[in-house]
Amino acid sequence: AYGESANVFGAP
């Protein structure tokens, strides 16, 4: 979900 830990894209 949005606002969880950093993902593969590097977004928050």
Curated annotation (Swiss-Prot):
Biological function: May be involved in the regulation of photosystem II.
Name of protein: Oxygen-evolving enhancer protein 2
Inducing factors: By light.
Family, similarity comment: Belongs to the PsbP family.
BP terms from Gene Ontology: photosynthesis
Organism: Physcomitrium patens
Principal subcellular localisation of the protein: plastid
Entry's localization field: Plastid, Chloroplast thylakoid membrane
Disulfide topology: none
Keywords: Chloroplast, Membrane, Photosynthesis, Photosystem II, Plastid, Thylakoid
One Gene Ontology cellular component: photosystem II
